[in-house]
Amino acid sequence: MGQKVSPNVLRLGIVRDWEDTWYAEKDQYVKWLDQDIKIREGVLKLLKDAAVSKIKIERTNSNITLIIRTARPAIVLGQEGKNVSNIATAVQKIAKDRNLKVEVKVIEVKNPDADATLVARWIGEQITNRASFRTVQKLAIRKALKAGVKGIKTSVSGRLGGVEMARTEGYIEGSVPLSTLRADIDYALYEAPTTYGQIGVKVWINHGEVIGGQSQRVSEKAPMNNDRRFNNKNNNRGGRK
């Protein structure tokens, strides 16, 4: 029986790199891994309005480098680097080492409409604000195709529109070859809180095939086709909103 797997994990070492880059002995591995999880949670909490896409961590015994990909670099830096100092202090507190040297590097996401993490978060935030889950998915797909992606797939799950029974609805446009390992697939999951429960938002974006170590991303507008919607078996129950 087939099983689903994260497209990001499936492509590690092939077309994607690890988000943590360090080496540790057995007794130190668990400690550093736990710290990395807490560091990401803490930094995302501090930069909740900065549209952070990914946080890569590189570290040694005495140094740690955070590489933050964001669509709003000015918010990450803050006035006179104030936010950077706050991040460094938070990391030292989590690591319980005041002498730990913390370096923060900021990389700007020039096209947030083609970033799966930012697209999923935007869809989730709109659903939290009571926007139509169908409308926001179509709008996100339209923006992504205009940004030049090869294909995009979206999916929302939960009590859509506040109905009694949970279901899944989504759209797909263009080519999204999840089984092609050389395809540069960007995947993200976001949980949107609503008054009637959590709504899960998933986004898959295809940036093209990786050839010679470089992704063949297009810059021109992709062709617009008719929307193709997929529903699960429970879609006919609970009514349409």
UniProtKB/Swiss-Prot annotation:
GO cellular component terms?
cytosolic small ribosomal subunit
> What keywords are annotated for this sequence in UniProt?
Ribonucleoprotein, Ribosomal protein, RNA-binding, rRNA-binding
The UniProt GO MF terms for this protein read: mRNA binding; rRNA binding; structural constituent of ribosome
Biological process annotations from GO: translation
Q: Say yes or no: keyword Thylakoid present.
A: no
KH type-2 domain span: 39-108
Keyword hit for Ribonucleoprotein: yes
> Bias regions of kind Low complexity — which residues?
232-241
What the entry lists under InterPro entries is as follows:
KH_dom, KH_dom-like_a/b, KH_dom_type_2, KH_sf_prok-type, Ribosomal_S3_C_sf, Ribosomal_uS3_bac-typ, Ribosomal_uS3_C, Ribosomal_uS3_CS
Residues annotated as region Disordered?
A: 215-241
| PANTHER family cross-referenced by the UniProt entry | 30S/40S RIBOSOMAL PROTEIN S3, SMALL RIBOSOMAL SUBUNIT PROTEIN US3C
Q: What does this protein do?
A: Binds the lower part of the 30S subunit head. Binds mRNA in the 70S ribosome, positioning it for translation.
Q: How does it assemble?
A: Part of the 30S ribosomal subunit. Forms a tight complex with proteins S10 and S14.
Sequence similarity: Belongs to the universal ribosomal protein uS3 family.
Question: What is the recorded name of this protein?
Answer: Small ribosomal subunit protein uS3
Give the species this sequence originates from.
Answer: Mesoplasma florum (strain ATCC 33453 / NBRC 100688 / NCTC 11704 / L1) (Acholeplasma florum)
